[in-house]
Amino acid sequence: MQTVSSPKQKLNFGQRLLTLLQNRDFMVSLVLTVVLLILFRVLAIIPLPGIRINESVLDRNSNDFFSLFNLLGGGGLNQLSLFAVGISPYISAQIIMQLLSTDLIPPLSKLVNSGEVGRRKIEMITRIITLPFALVQAFAVIQIATNAGTGSSPISLANSGSEFIAFYIIAMTAGTYMAVFLGDTISKKGVGNGITLLILSGILSQLPQGFIAAYNVLSGIVITLTPQLTAAISFFIYFLAFLVLLFATTFITQATRKIPIQQSGQGLVSEVKTLPYLPIKVNAAGVIPVIFASSIMSIPVTIAQFQPQTESRWFVEDYLSLSTPVGIFLYAVLVILFSFFYSYIQINPERLAKNFEKSGRFIPGIRPGNDTEKHIARVLIRINFIGAPFLTVIAIIPYIVSYFIRLPNSLSLGGTGIIIIVTAVVEFISALRSAATATNYQQLRRNLAIEVQQTAKQDSLEQLQKEAPGIGNLW
């Protein structure tokens, strides 16, 4: 008789992989995801008509505005492609909707608590808000592009007439909605979070070129060794530091503080380990504080580039630029403040306390209601004293390295990119594990049904043999 393994048994990597390969629906979803990501990358490297790329100044690091939106947009900004603005306007709209969906605007707060219908309305409003963001960002990119003659922009337009500018703005805005459509399709019919995977594809596509550029820059460091040995040793240290930061970021991203939860009427539980728990991540705010801080610091510097050489421009470049110690310090302060602020919005202790009270759940030793809210808030503040400084260190490392070494920001370690890489990969692996677990349960159910049928047939045959002992000899 076939034995059925327990569904509680954990699958190893080989078993998960074999289970997924046997799942036809999953393989179709995986192929769809890969095809859409390839389509996104192909369209991201094809410039729009009439674009002239200035290879001599093609430097992602020449402007913080370019660097941030090229990262969030999916890497299409360098070529001024259809996806030049990418999904960064949609991300900005999502962040604003999250902020407004708190108690700031009660109608939006009600929509958040209205289930699937409310979620769809929130998504529709988010896409409407995306439009002005896309138009403004596309216009800003075009303005920088048309001023490429100053040497501050890596791109320029062959024709800067008003009709061409309008065409580019409309095309890049349409590209934003097309990128959002691709991301939604991956999320619904593919594997993983589509928006995150689009951003990840842009970052990974630039990694090889970034490593080569870093090797070339590091080979120029003057050491009393041969140039080849100097470059090899420097790049080995660089790559090793990259891996260390990658693993450290993964550890902090996965680290959680578990708050035990008990259901009313469940009775006393002797061991807290057996209770369900509320997981609060050490880095509950994710990458959003870094995006906020980068945006605030890059806006005045970008505007100053279009101003004449005045005292105000010198002040911005001397004190707000991320290439100066004062600018780096202000950037670090903003990241810490936004980490505490946004993590509180993400967790929302008040809403959690109300939901616990409505569902009859409570934290052992803590009274429901206001005491529960204060307890969750205290826990959140304590873990933020770990998560916020770590996030700040990761965010400022590129600028510190760039300040002390001749390594450009975009080639330095850490920053928004490494956090997005870790977050996207962790989400994708979680999606694979969930799919493998679901497939395993389906197989277990089928095997169990077959075993039940076989057992029923065996029992019926044994019953017949008991009632008529000679029936077995008739066959």
From Swiss-Prot:
**GO MF terms on file?**
protein transmembrane transporter activity; signal sequence binding
Q: Sorted alphabetically, which SUPFAM superfamilies does this protein's record hold?
A: Preprotein translocase SecY subunit
The principal location of this protein is membrane
Subcellular localization(s) per the UniProt record = Cell membrane
What family, per the record? Belongs to the SecY/SEC61-alpha family.
Tell me which NCBIfam families the record gives. Answer: 3a0501s007 (TIGR00967)
Oligomeric and partner information: Component of the Sec protein translocase complex. Heterotrimer consisting of SecY, SecE and SecG subunits. The heterotrimers can form oligomers, although 1 heterotrimer is thought to be able to translocate proteins. Interacts with the ribosome. Interacts with SecDF, and other proteins may be involved. Interacts with SecA.
Which protein are we looking at?
Protein translocase subunit SecY
Which taxonomic lineage does the organism of this UniProt entry have? Bacteria, Bacillati, Mycoplasmatota, Mycoplasmoidales, Mycoplasmoidaceae
